[in-house]
A protein has these predicted regions:
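Conserved beta-strand signature within the Rossmann-like core of class I S-adenosyl-L-methionine
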Residues: 279-286, 632-639
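Conserved class I S-adenosyl-L-methionine
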Residues: 174-183, 528-537
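Class I SAM-dependent transferase core
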Residues: 12, 16, 21-46, 52-58, ...
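A short SAM/SAH-binding and catalytic strip from SAM-dependent methyltransferases
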Residues: 245-263, 598-616
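A short acidic, Gly/Pro-enriched loop at the edge of an enzyme's catalytic core
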Residues: 238-247, 590-600
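A short glycine-rich, Lys/Arg-flanked "PGG" loop and its adjoining helix->strand segment in the class I
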Residues: 193, 264-278, 616-631
Length: 689
């Protein structure tokens, strides 16, 4: 047993950071996982579907054979190559393949209506046709097809060694298995064959399209020992009386770790513990990072040490682990008592590469509450309805009450969300003319008000109504800790999210929760300096920096989201601001000229770099920062901390500062200052060594 594996068993709550690579990755914000070879082969397959020319299939297969080992190990390419070979196979061979139920269902889904879904998948996946940002249904369809083609791939054995790892699971006839996050049931139906008529498999899934496929496949093939279960964030969905011998979680726990709130994850893992018999097994299959240019990238991943350290605190003891390919591992845990006398060790920024995991909380989270929208809570909804009614009825008493309700609530939940912004609009509504003029004396605040408050608060009213889904009444017994989402279809989701970002980040009351003035003083920005605001959003800090550096200074405002940049461009043009230069960038390049900046500033962004950037993308991005910094220049990172369960958390993403400090140390940055003005927010200042 090597040293790393030994540590998983002997010191499960300690993590050694030994390289620049992130410990967890949940997927790219950009399309760097789409390769030229994949696009070429996809177009050849698409063209074959149109004209039936088999030469195109041979060309596609030749392309896939060249790129699969290097570009897309474990991805969709092996499935698409399988389809090409199927189309070329003799009729007898085709019939033999389709005699296998899962392969037949795979082909049936993709071939229906003259391969309509396969055509849609190739066109959207490889950006041959672009999907509208507000077309939620098409995006959901694409997500289903991505999962379906990836997971029910008839050639999955080729990259995963499925038979070998299933032997490691040691599933026995008669056992009861919960397949959590079953997707379209690849493992569920394999487990069903093993456990036999005396056993039972629960295929547990949240995606409605996967659920429909599972039910149809079970009905069509008269499968008696698989039961479909609808899961929610509150738990895996099994009824209180169901007990299972094994819970199986494949290609999911990286999301449980990084995308669930602590509350959601406690419910989720708690329901797994409840369902397992004493001594029952939790089997996790997930992706590992391969730090080698000779082996291809394989999508989301989570380090075994990060995963094991968390599950230790939930009462799961690692009893076996197996690396059946460099990119894929199996971890097998036994349900034991939850540690009751654990004594944690303090972490130190002086030794950031040695991390003590003292609780079950994640060291980083990425899910902004509400995955389709900005989301809302039950308590927030009550405040929002009071404010909406007050503005619609022009009732100062209700507006005042809404203000007071938000003022009481915002320190308790969703720090940094829009509650203090709602308070600002209530304050403006209730103010006299002199106070209103004072509140709009700042250019940025005037534009902010005009956008949401113009035409008798038209957009503000709409935002309140949609944000809190006021047309829909929540159940009276809804849990106040649960996050809800707007589910209506009469307002574009993309527009709502765009409004939400502008509403939150350019909030004139932002200083209430962030202590912005104190933060800006600590940054020591001088007149005449050049500063880059990376991921500037609506330009809140860009505008502040513009005032601080003066006419002789320059602020480079960079953003990958063109829609966010338009608010800043409008401010520049309307008020003739000369010292701001806007740059539309990509995740791998901040587009700064060499030695152009005294300071590079990133607010609420590095967590995304850490958890969503493919490693080579992160390498290139940080190299572009180093290129742009002048000798002696500083990299300043403001981000959201992960808090303990007794401290209200920032409403969206968060990251343990030690993860940033340790990672940047491998890129040659030395921490020179750390400040923590509030529990939910920290400032890190780095210089190149």
């Amino acid at each position: 047993m090597d040293e790393q594996n030994r540590a998983l068993y002997e010191t499960p709550t300690e993590i050694e950071v030994t390289a620049k690579d992130s410990l967890v990755h949940v997927g790219s914000l950009d399309s760097f996982d789409i390769t030229k070879g994949g696009i070429k082969a996809g177009k050849l397959l698409l063209k074959y579907l149109d004209n039936g020319n088999e030469k195109l299939l041979h060309q596609a297969i030749k392309t896939y054979e060249k790129i699969i080992p290097d570009e897309n190990f474990g991805g969709e390419y092996t499935a698409l190559e399988w389809l090409c070979k199927y189309f070329l196979a003799p009729e007898e061979a085709k019939q033999d393949l389709l005699s296998k139920p899962l392969i037949k269902s795979f082909y049936d889904v993709l071939s229906k209506d003259d391969f309509a879904d396969l055509r849609t998948y190739i066109q959207l996946k490889y950006h041959i046709v672009e999907v509208d940002k507000n077309d939620v249904e098409t995006k959901r369809k694409l997500r289903f097809l991505e999962d379906f083609i990836l997971f029910n791939n008839p050639d999955r054995e080729r990259w995963e060694k499925t038979r070998e790892n299933m032997e490691k699971f040691n599933i026995q006839p008669g056992e009861r298995i919960a397949d959590v996050g079953s997707g379209p049931g690849y493992f569920s139906f394999k487990f069903a064959d093993i456990v036999g008529d005396e056993g039972k498999v629960y295929a547990i899934e949240t995606n409605p399209m996967h659920l429909d496929f599972l039910r149809d496949h079970i009905k069509e093939n008269d499968i008696k020992n698989v039961e479909v279960v609808v899961s929610q964030f509150e738990g895996i969905g099994l009824t209180e009386d169901v007990r299972v011998d094994t819970v199986f979680v494949c290609s999911l726990y990286h999301n449980v770790y990084a995308a669930f709130t602590d509350f959601e994850r406690e419910k989720f893992v708690g329901s797994i513990r409840h369902a397992l018999v004493e001594g029952g097994k939790l089997i996790i299959v997930d992706n590992d990072l391969v730090d080698s240019s000779e082996l291809p990238y394989h999508g989301p991943y989570i380090s075994k040490s990060l995963l094991t350290s968390q599950l230790y605190h939930y009462g799961f003891k690692l009893i076996d682990n197996y690396q059946f390919t460099p990119q894929r591992y199996v971890l097998i845990y036994e349900k034991v008592d939850v540690p009751s006398d654990f004594k944690g060790k303090e972490n130190s920024i002086d030794d950031p590469c040695h991390i003590h995991v003292n609780t079950a909380g994640s060291l980083i989270r990425y899910r902004i509450i509400g995955t389709s929208t900005a989301g809302y809570s039950i308590r927030g909804k009550a405040c929002g309805k009071m404010m909406y009614d007050g503005f619609m009825e022009n009732d100062p008493e209700k507006v005042q009450k809404a203000h007071d309700m938000f003022a009481e609530l915002w320190p308790k939940e969703r720090i940094g969300d829009d509650y203090t912004a709602f308070m600002w609009f209530c304050e403006y509504y209730l103010a006299d003319d002199n106070k209103k003029a004072e509140m709009l004396s700042d250019y940025r605040d005037k534009m902010y008000f005009d956008f949401f408050g113009g035409n008798d608060y038209e957009k503000l009213k709409k935002y309140l109504y949609i944000k809190f889904y006021l047309e829909h009444e929540e159940a009276e017994d809804a849990d106040i800790e649960t996050c809800f989402e707007y589910e209506g279809k009469d307002f574009p989701i993309g527009t709502l999210n765009e409004w939400n970002e502008y509403f939150v980040f350019n909030n004139p009351n932002r200083f209430l929760w962030e202590k912005t003035d104190t933060m800006l003083d600590l940054l020591d920005i001088k007149e005449g300096e050049s500063i880059a605001d990376l991921g500037c959003g609506g330009g809140y800090f860009t505008y502040e920096f513009s005032k601080m550096v003066g006419d002789k200074g320059t602020v480079y405002a960079t953003e990958i989201n063109k829609d966010a940049m338009k608010y800043l461009d409008a401010l520049k043009d309307t008020y003739n601001v000369k010292n701001i230069k806007t740059l539309v960038t990509r995740m791998n390049d901040c587009k700064l000229k060499e030695n152009s900046c005294d300071k590079v500033f990133m607010c609420s962004m590095y967590h995304a770099v850490y958890i969503t950037d493919i490693e080579f993308v992160k390498d290139e991005f940080i190299a572009s920062i180093k290129k742009g910094l002048r000798p002696g220049g500083q990299l300043i990172i403001v981000d959201n901390d992960v808090t303990d369960r007794f401290t209200p958390s920032y409403y969206g993403p968060g990251i343990m500062p030690e993860l940033i400090i340790s990672q940047l140390s491998f890129y040659g940055f030395k921490l020179v200052k750390k400040e923590q003005l509030i529990p939910q927010r920290f400032i890190l200042v780095f210089e190149l060594q």
